[in-house]
């Protein structure tokens, strides 16, 4: 029998949406395939609301809290400091490992997952929800128009050690059309995760390795790369409409932005919260 709702996607957002539907007794299945992992390199930064949302779903999180964010402009003397205490919060953000979260979500949604071969007839499904831009599922998502922009940048992410940075602090610096952010990860002393956005003209792994010491000097610490370096091309995309009759977009399928904003999954979780609430209202009215 076909589910009332089908969420389509291969990442974290699709599985989170399915779990939230299940928690609210909404009939939902996930059209997905084997998850893609990143060798424990990729990380996610959650705001306090998103962190509490995952806790509400019973997800176990090994998170590295950020209580302060320090932003520098390397060509001047400007510094902006943000503190959780100033906002009355325990922390400003939490850094978690992407692979660990996806692996846990994949296990929690096993009984809800369906393959394309299992769901060939979509006529009895009331609502299809698209949760990412996985090319495997692009054929299902053809009724939406998007506004897109190429940032002409590549983001490099990797783990690093830094001996003089404070444990619960995140640091961000702007220089030469580049953005460098370093944040705590794994609750291991002096271990951090880095996201470094570099113009495509000179964005290479060699450039990253050759210039990491300069970033360390700007932050008054030594920074040493540890392990693999991942690279992602950066662009933004926003749907002109998020919902049409029988179809909705959430998370990366609806909008994607520069990692500078730190919104990523946070916006996706907000989408999930709002859309499932609308489903609950419709269900209470017998729709």
Where are these regions (language model features)?
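Short beta-strand/turn micro-motifs composed of small residues
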Residues: 9, 32, 73, 132, ...
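Conserved N-terminal helical subregion
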Residues: 52-56, 64-157
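Conserved FAD-binding catalytic core of PHBH/FMO-like flavoproteins
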Residues: 125-128, 132-229
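FAD/FMN-dependent oxidoreductases across multiple families
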Residues: 203-285
């Amino acid at each position: 029998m076909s589910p009332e709702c089908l969420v389509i996607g291969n990442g974290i957002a699709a599985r989170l949406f399915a779990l939230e539907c299940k928690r609210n007794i909404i009939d939902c299945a996930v059209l997905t395939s084997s998850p893609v992992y990143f060798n424990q390199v990729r990380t996610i930064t959650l705001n306090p609301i998103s962190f509490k949302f995952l806790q509400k779903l019973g997800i176990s999180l090994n998170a590295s809290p950020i209580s302060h964010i320090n932003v520098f402009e390397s060509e001047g003397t400007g510094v902006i400091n943000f503190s959780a205490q100033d906002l009355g919060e325990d922390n400003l953000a939490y850094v978690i490992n992407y692979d660990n979260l996806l692996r846990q979500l994949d296990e929690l949604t096993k009984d809800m997952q369906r393959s394309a071969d299992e769901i060939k007839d979509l006529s009895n499904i009331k609502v299809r929800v698209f949760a990412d831009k996985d090319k495997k599922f692009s054929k299902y998502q053809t009724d939406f128009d998007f506004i897109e922009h190429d940032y002409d940048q590549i983001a490099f992410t990797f783990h690093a050690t830094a001996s003089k940075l404070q444990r619960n602090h995140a640091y961000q610096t702007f220089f030469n059309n580049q953005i460098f952010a370093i944040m705590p990860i794994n609750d291991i002393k002096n271990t951090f995760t880095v996201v470094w956005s570099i113009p495509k003209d000179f964005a290479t792994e060699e450039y990253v390795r050759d210039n990491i010491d300069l970033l360390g000097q700007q932050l008054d610490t030594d920074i040493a790369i540890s392990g693999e370096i991942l690279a992602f091309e950066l662009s933004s995309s926003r749907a002109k409409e998020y919902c049409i009759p029988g179809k909705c977009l959430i998370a990366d399928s609806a909008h994607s932005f520069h990692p500078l904003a730190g919104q990523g999954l946070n916006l996706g979780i907000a989408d999930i919260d709002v859309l499932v609430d609308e489903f609950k209202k419709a269900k209470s009215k017998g729709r």
